[in-house]
Structure formats: C-alpha cells, structure tokens
Amino acid sequence: MSGAIAAAVLAAFGQDIYNSIFHRPPGPLGGLPVLIDHSSEIVREGYFVALPQKAQLQNSQLKSLSTGKPEAYDWAMARGGAEGPRTSIKLVVEGHREHAVKIIGVEAVKERCHEPLSGSLFAAYSAGGEENISMLFDLDAPRSLAKEPGGEDPSMLSDYFEVHSISLTRGEQQTLVLNATSEKRYCEFKLKFTVVDGKSTVAQWVDDSGRPFRVTSLRKFNEYGSLYFGGVSTYQCGGGWVRRDPQSFGDQNPYSFSGGVGC
C-alpha cells in the first residue's frame, strides 16, 4: 500500500487499527517447524531434458518453442520429461517457531528408478554460469544424503551435515539450491528434511507440487528416437530450436559435446 493510504487509515481509524494492518505479527505457530517454499524459479542458462516417448515436432511447433510460447523446457517437462544428468531445485526455508529450529539432514529418497529415458532429447547449450549450489545428491548411491558441492566424483564428497547445520529463528529465511544427479539411470524422488524442533525431531517431506522430482542420466546421441538442439548451439542458424537426426552425432555424449549442429 502507498504511504498516502497508510496515513489515511491512521487518521480515520486510529493507531490500533493501523498496527493491525501495517504491522501484523508473524502467522500462527501451528503446523510444521519449517516452512519450505518451492515456488522460486531456478535460473537455467542451459539444460538437457529427455522424454520417455519419441516426439516428432512439426516446423510450426518448433517455431512456437523458439519464441518461448511455451518454453521448450516447460513443454517437455509437462510431457513426462526429466532433466539430465542433474536437476536443480530451489527452496526457501523459513523458521516457524518462537524458538530456533535446526535442519540437521536432507536426503533424496528414491521412489523408483529404471533405465534412462530414450524417447527424445532437448539439448539447450549455454555459455553462461549457474546458480551457486548448496548441496548435491548422488542418486546412484544406495542412500542419497546431502553432500558438499564440488569435485567430479560425488562418492568422494563430504556429507554436508557432518560439518553444517541450518538454524532458523522465527521468520528467518534461507535459500537453498539443491542438485540431484544420476549417471546411470532415471529416478523419481522426494526430499526428506530432518528438523530438530525443541525436544522433538521431525521429518518434513518436499515434492514437486504433488509429484516426485525426476532426473535421468543421458544416453549417447544415437540412442534417442529424436533430437532437438537449442541455446547457443543454434545461434549460427539464427537461434531457436532445430531438429536433427540423432544418428548423425553417433555415440557422442550430449553433456560433453562441443561441435556444431549445422544449419
């Protein structure tokens, strides 16, 4: 509200009503000890999304995706797609008790895993950076506990909560960017937060708006049914999304590919 409206409310109704509108105390303390918000969008400069089925897009559809109506990422994810070989999740956690609460563990709990997706691949290459990662989860491990980010081999990384904890007072917020990876398979998972709330330890679960999060390892180019390139790889062709024959790129790994896609 504007300052003029606030002043009018103060003049008309007095200090008590003014305070109830403009200086509301934090919400009720019932419910879980940590509020976890998954509504923040991650910054994706580039990505790989694989579909379980082969998608044969017409030129008109590619033109629509190239103009961002809809975004190719959203279009593919809405059709059962999964990012690979990692997916990033941004969460905002907030303390919801009069006393400080402490997050002492986060685990990616796998619900089901199987062979990596092979229907279609959308490969959007990027020349930019990424958001700073808070924690890493290796979904190829027997248990996918939060690890310190950094390094090439997730199995060699330190457990995040062996040296850290996240303490939150009432209303205090912290943003977490979590990366879940797989080099071997497709997995669906949820996140389990372990929180110390006074004398109790509470488990809080986070999913993707009622569905599990998804991630898939990447296959070689020639193992996909159809292939689409976007991002900086198509700038020389005028930008946007282009369709290419997966067999033309042989057994190269999409993640490490650095060649041209042709115009």
Residue positions per predicted region:
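Low-complexity, intrinsically disordered segments enriched in Ser/Thr together with acidic residues
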Residues: 155-187
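Ser/Thr/Pro-rich, low-complexity mucin-like regions
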Residues: 179-202
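Membrane-aqueous junction of the first/signal-anchor transmembrane helix
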Residues: 1-65
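Short, hydrophobic/aromatic beta-strand segments
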Residues: 99-107, 117-120, 147-149, 188-190
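Long, charge-dense
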Residues: 112-154
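Short, solvent-exposed beta-strand/turn "edge" segments of beta-rich domains on protein surfaces
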Residues: 73-84, 92-101, 116, 167
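Short acidic, flexible loop segments centered on an aromatic residue
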Residues: 104-113, 150-154, 193-197
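Acidic, serine/threonine- and proline-rich intrinsically disordered appendage/tail regions
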Residues: 140-153, 196-263
